């Protein structure tokens, strides 16, 4: 049927996961939260990037939810085996290899792990209009429907090695590009009040994002709900007219057109 005011979703979401040894056991909760929530997506695009010393795009921005769910479910199944030392001890060689294959490409720099700023910039590069270097991001090119962009950054903010971008520099770039970055602490509960965690909280919030610790039982779901609530408003101009895929409508229109054409042709013969 014809809908003169069909709303087009305007959200792009990148899941940006730290897969260093200290953060990897907690990533499954983030993935599982989005697996549950993706059921309610209608036109949103979602992508997944993982990083340690270097980054790998697991899947780019897509609204192919079948593909996204398949990739997220596979990752959730894999990471279920590394959530505790006892589970790690029970892994078979095949499972070790599958996890290693999934992480391939994230540790290409020697003597460096968990380069948070670099990982965040790589995640931002998945979003339309982001350009490396601060001079250009003030002029971010907006897509046709002015899509909003957000990143969910899950990390414990424990850096080891020299970064190209600090977390602050990366957040400055994303803010200039009008990309919202929300932070999720992915680390051991006893380290929640460490300087690195408090610094991450301060930087995320000062750049307009939400910071939560996923050690609270429902905090991952709360973060997801807050992101969804933030982006539910459709920008002006995002409504468009559209025909649904209804063959009955096209048959009626075709018949109507033929009738009109025959009437005109008959009148012209007179």
Please identify what each model-predicted range represents.
Residues 1-3, 233-270:
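C-terminal signal-anchor/stop-transfer transmembrane helix together with its immediate cytosolic
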Residues 24-26, 56-60, 159-164, 191-195, ...:
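Extracytoplasmic/secreted cell-surface and envelope-processing proteins
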Residues 18:
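Residues that scaffold, gate, or flank divalent-cation-dependent active/transport sites
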Residues 35-46, 73-80, 124-132, 175-176, ...:
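Sec-exported extracytoplasmic/periplasmic mature domains
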């Amino acid at each position: 049927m014809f809908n003169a005011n069909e709303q087009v979703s305007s959200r792009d979401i990148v899941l940006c996961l730290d897969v260093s040894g200290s953060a990897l056991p907690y990533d499954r909760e983030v993935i599982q939260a989005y697996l549950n929530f993706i059921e309610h997506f209608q036109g949103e695009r979602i992508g997944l990037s993982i990083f340690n010393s270097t980054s790998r795009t697991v899947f780019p921005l897509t609204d192919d939810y079948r593909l996204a769910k398949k990739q997220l479910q596979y990752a959730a199944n894999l990471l279920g085996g590394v959530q505790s030392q006892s589970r790690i001890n029970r892994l078979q060689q095949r499972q070790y290899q599958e996890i290693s294959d999934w992480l391939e490409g994230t540790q290409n720099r020697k003597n460096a792990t968990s380069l948070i700023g670099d990982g965040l910039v790589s995640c931002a590069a998945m979003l339309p209009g982001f350009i490396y270097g601060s001079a250009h991001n003030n002029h971010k090119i907006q897509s046709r429907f002015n899509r909003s962009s957000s990143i969910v950054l899950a990390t414990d903010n424990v850096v080891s090695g020299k970064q190209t971008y600090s977390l602050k520099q990366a957040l400055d770039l994303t803010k200039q590009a009008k990309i919202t970055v929300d932070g999720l602490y992915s680390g051991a509960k006893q380290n929640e009040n460490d300087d690195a965690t408090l610094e991450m909280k301060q930087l995320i919030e000062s750049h307009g994002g939400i910071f939560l610790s996923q050690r609270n039982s429902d905090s991952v779901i709360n973060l997801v709900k807050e992101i969804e609530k933030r982006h539910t408003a459709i920008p002006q101009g995002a409504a468009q007219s559209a025909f649904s895929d209804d063959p009955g409508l096209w048959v009626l229109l075709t018949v109507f057109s033929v009738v009109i054409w025959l009437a005109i042709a008959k009148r012209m013969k007179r």
